[in-house]
């Protein structure tokens, strides 16, 4: 290159080829700034690759700083996993058992009814009533799987829900093939027996002396929307004179005898069913009392049973 040409073109041809790439990276910079950047790029070749890596050029060399963007997308790749789509799957186990139990409870009740029939309960209306009432709704959730076993289960406050066989037996004795108009239950408890009675009687009156159980029975019965049950908080030994006389009275607690007030509230021809015996439960007997005249009652002793004691007053 001649001296005159060198003055006009102070840069070599190779430098002129690289200058546009540098000017593309830093748009808006002057020719003088671009010219001064070229020697620096020649001294440090790796620095030239930085713009290439930023623009995603395919010619980035291995072992240079172009390897850094390879790790940069990783946070972006992890972002879709952060919502954890497995979370809804974790909820499935808690829902499935409850749903499965709800679907099978009807069949479990049917098997319970078959056992009742095999044990001597013959009144179809009683069997239908036992099949219609979901007993698992009246016990604690932890005991729901045992709801249709023939067992008494605790409901709190030292009280129990009676065995299905005992509930069916007492209601069948109270009915004696009749259509019941007005029934009084002493000892509402969790409300299960009242719910069964509501299927065989026009009106059911039930008294509970323990306030928390009275409130619990109301909550248990509310989803069933039973229109013919009237719950009362009070002393069961006194009965409910304002609603007497009753076609049937069912007492769900054992006393040494049947309170006279309850005998007086029984209609002529009515039947009272109650466990009678010591509070220890060793000598309790299911007893049937029939009112045959205004001042005459007939008593029959039937089955050995075990009930919580019949107490007076309210708590």
Curated annotation (Swiss-Prot):
Low complexity composition-biased segments: 35-47, 59-81
Ranges where the record places region Disordered: 1-47, 59-89
Main location: cytoplasm
Catalysed conversion reaction: [protein]-L-isoaspartate + S-adenosyl-L-methionine = [protein]-L-isoaspartate alpha-methyl ester + S-adenosyl-L-homocysteine
Cellular compartments annotated: Cytoplasm
Keywords: Cytoplasm, Methyltransferase, S-adenosyl-L-methionine, Transferase
Role according to the record: Catalyzes the methyl esterification of L-isoaspartyl residues in peptides and proteins that result from spontaneous decomposition of normal L-aspartyl and L-asparaginyl residues. It plays a role in the repair and/or degradation of damaged proteins.
Name of protein: Protein-L-isoaspartate O-methyltransferase
Organism: Burkholderia ambifaria (strain MC40-6)
């Amino acid at each position: 290159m001649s001296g005159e040409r060198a003055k006009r073109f102070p840069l070599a041809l190779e430098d002129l080829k690289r200058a546009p790439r540098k000017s593309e990276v830093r748009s808006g910079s002057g020719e003088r700034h671009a010219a001064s950047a070229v020697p620096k790029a020649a001294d440090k070749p790796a620095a030239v690759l930085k713009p290439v890596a930023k623009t995603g050029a395919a010619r980035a060399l291995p072992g240079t700083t172009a390897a850094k963007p390879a790790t940069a997308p990783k946070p972006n790749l992890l972002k879709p996993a952060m919502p954890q789509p497995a979370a809804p799957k974790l909820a499935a186990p808690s829902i499935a058992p409850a749903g499965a139990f709800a679907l099978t409870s009807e069949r479990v009740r049917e098997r319970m009814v078959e056992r009742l029939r095999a044990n001597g309960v013959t009144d179809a209306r009683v069997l239908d009533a036992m099949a219609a009432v979901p007993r698992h709704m009246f016990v604690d959730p932890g005991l729901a799987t045992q709801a249709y076993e023939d067992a008494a289960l605790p409901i709190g406050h030292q009280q129990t829900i009676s065995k299905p066989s005992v509930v069916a037996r007492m209601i069948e004795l109270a009915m004696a093939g009749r259509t019941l108009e007005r029934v009084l239950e002493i000892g509402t408890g969790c409300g299960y027996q009242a719910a069964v009675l509501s299927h065989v009687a026009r009106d059911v009156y039930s008294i509970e002396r323990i306030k928390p159980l009275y409130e619990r029975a109301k909550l248990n019965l509310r989803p069933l929307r039973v229109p013919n049950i009237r719950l009362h908080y009070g002393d069961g030994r006194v009965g409910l004179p304002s609603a007497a006389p009753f076609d049937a009275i069912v007492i769900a607690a054992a006393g040494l005898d049947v309170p006279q007030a309850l005998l007086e509230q029984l209609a002529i021809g009515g039947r009272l069913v109650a466990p009678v015996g010591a509070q220890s439960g060793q000598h309790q007997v299911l007893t049937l009392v029939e009112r045959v005249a205004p001042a005459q009652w007939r008593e029959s002793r039937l089955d050995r049973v075990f009930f919580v004691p019949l107490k007076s007053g309210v708590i």
